[in-house]
A protein has these predicted regions:
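Active-site-proximal alpha-helical scaffold in enzymes
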Residues: 79-92, 141-145, 149-154, 158-193, ...
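Conserved small-residue
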Residues: 11, 29, 83, 104, ...
C-alpha cells in the first residue's frame, strides 16, 4: 500500500471585513470586534437590507495596477491578494519550485455576480453588441483559481469547487487529499467571494435569508435566541498546504497540520438543512475518523453558524451527535458576516489561529443563547484554553457539508 503524505500548513492570507493582514485579523478575532456596518457599495434602500460586512481599506496597490480592476472581478483580486500573502508567509520561491507539482484550488459560490448584473443592464439598455468582451472571463466562477495560477505560474491541478457556502472548505479538503495521495507537493487552497451588490442582496433578501436588523451590533448573532438571518460579507482566505516531507526539506516554518476531511450531502432540500443535522454530523465524523482521534479530543468547533434559525439549530444537533460536550463552539460570522463561498477559507485561517494562539474566538454580541442550542457556545469574550484539535464546518445550499480537522503543530 502506498504511503500517505502528512499535510501541513505553511502560510495563510486573508482579506476580510475584520482585517486584510494577519495582525489586524488576529487582534479583531481575539477582541471580538465585528466588521459589520451600513452598506456602502451601492444604494440598498430599495432592498430592505441595510447592513453588510464589507472589506475596508483594501490595499490594491500592493499587488495590482489600475488596469487589473478592469480585467478581474473583485473576488479574483481578493483571492490573488490572499494567495500572495500566504505564499510570502510560506517562504516558497516559485522560481525554485517544480511548478508542475504546485496546484490551486480556490472555491467561490457565485463568482462575478456584479459583472453579470452590470452587463445584463448594459445589454438591456444598449443591445447585445455592447456587452463587454470581458464579460465571460470576469463572470465565470473558476477565474479566482485561474487568475491565482496565472499570477504565480502554478501548472499543477487548478480547479474551483462550487458548492455554495461550502465551497472554500471543500477546496481546502480536496487540496489536502491531493497532497495526501501524492499528486501534488504544494497546494494553494481556499475560497473567495464578493457579491455585495443589488442583485446579490436582493436575491438573498427574497429568500428571507438576510437579517433586516438596522443595528450593526445585533445583525449577525449566531446561536442567539433573537437571530433572524445572516449578514452578507466578502473577502478571501487562502492557505498554503504542503506535504510534510516537502516542507521539511526546504526548512519551512510549519504552522499547523490538516489531519482530516469530511464531505457529505443532506439530500433533503434546496436551501434548508436537514433539521436533525444528520448530514453535517456525518461530515464531522468522517473528518475526525480520518484524523484517527477520539471525538472527545476535539477542543474547538468553528461552526458554520450563519445566524439563521434553521442552520444554527440543525448544526448544533450535528455537533452534539458527532462530538462531546468537551468541544467549545463559536461562530466567527458574528464578526465577519457570511462570506458565502469565501467563508471556509477565512474560517480555516481563524481556526488555525485559534490553535496557534490557544484560544477560542468569541461569538460576539450575544444577549441570550437560544435554549434549543445544545452546543457549548463561547460568547462575547475569547476564552484562553488548550486547543490541540479543531474542526471547521461549512454547510451550503444544495445540502453540501464540508468539514476539515486541524491539529496543532508540535515540532
Amino acid at each position: 500500500m502506498k504511503k500517505m503524505n502528512r499535510v501541513v500548513i505553511t502560510g495563510y492570507g486573508v482579506v476580510s471585513p475584520i482585517g486584510n493582514d494577519k495582525e489586524t485579523f488576529l487582534t479583531n478575532l481575539k477582541q471580538g470586534k465585528h466588521g459589520i456596518g451600513p452598506i456602502q457599495q451601492f444604494d440598498a434602500s430599495e432592498t430592505g437590507i441595510t447592513m453588510a460586512a464589507e472589506v475596508k481599506d483594501f490595499p490594491l496597490e500592493k499587488y495590482f495596477v489600475k488596469k487589473d480592476t478592469k480585467r478581474m472581478e473583485r473576488y479574483s483580486l481578493y483571492a490573488i491578494y490572499a494567495a500572495l500573502e500566504a505564499l510570502e508567509m510560506s517562504g516558497i520561491n516559485t522560481e525554485e519550485e517544480d511548478m508542475e507539482r504546485v496546484g490551486v484550488m480556490i472555491g467561490s459560490g457565485i463568482g462575478g455576480l456584479g459583472t453579470i448584473q452590470d452587463q445584463v443592464l448594459r445589454m438591456d439598455a444598449k443591445g447585445p453588441g455592447r456587452v463587454s468582451p470581458m464579460f465571460v472571463p470576469l463572470a465565470i466562477v473558476n477565474m479566482a483559481a485561474g487568475n491565482v495560477a496565472l499570477r504565480i505560474g502554478a501548472k499543477g491541478i487548478c480547479t474551483s469547487t462550487v458548492t455554495a457556502c461550502a465551497s472554500g472548505t471543500h477546496s481546502i479538503g480536496e487540496a489536502f487529499r491531493n497532497i495526501k495521495h501524492g499528486y501534488s507537493d504544494v497546494m494553494i487552497a481556499g475560497g473567495a467571494e464578493s457579491c455585495i451588490n443589488k442583485i446579490g442582496i436582493s436575491g438573498f433578501a427574497a429568500l428571507t435569508a438576510l437579517s433586516d436588523s438596522t443595528d450593526a451590533s445585533r445583525a449577525s448573532i449566531p446561536f442567539d435566541k433573537d437571530r433572524n438571518g445572516f449578514v452578507m460579507g466578502e473577502g478571501a482566505g487562502v492557505l498554503v498546504l504542503e506535504s510534510l516531507e516537502h516542507a521539511q526539506k526546504r526548512g519551512a516554518t510549519i504552522l499547523g497540520e490538516i489531519v482530516g476531511y469530511g464531505a457529505t450531502c443532506d439530500a433533503y432540500h434546496m436551501t434548508a438543512p436537514d433539521p436533525e443535522g444528520e448530514g453535517a454530523a456525518r461530515a464531522i465524523t468522517q473528518a475526525v475518523q480520518e484524523a484517527q482521534i477520539d471525538p472527545a479530543e476535539v477542543n474547538y468547533v468553528n461552526a458554520h453558524g450563519t445566524s439563521t434559525q434553521a442552520n444554527d439549530k440543525a448544526e448544533s444537533k450535528a455537533i452534539a451527535h458527532a462530538l462531546t460536550d468537551n468541544a467549545y463552539v463559536s461562530s466567527t460570522k458574528s464578526l465577519t458576516g457570511h462570506l458565502l463561498g469565501g467563508a471556509g477559507g477565512v474560517e480555516a485561517v481563524a481556526t488555525l489561529l485559534a490553535i496557534q494562539e490557544q484560544f477560542i474566538p468569541p461569538t460576539a454580541n450575544i444577549n441570550e443563547v437560544d435554549p434549543e442550542i445544545k452546543a457549548n457556545v463561547v460568547v462575547n469574550e475569547a476564552k484562553e484554553t488548550p486547543v490541540n484539535y479543531a474542526v471547521s464546518n461549512s454547510l451550503g445550499f444544495g445540502g453540501h457539508n464540508a468539514v476539515i480537522c486541524l491539529k496543532r503543530w508540535e515540532a
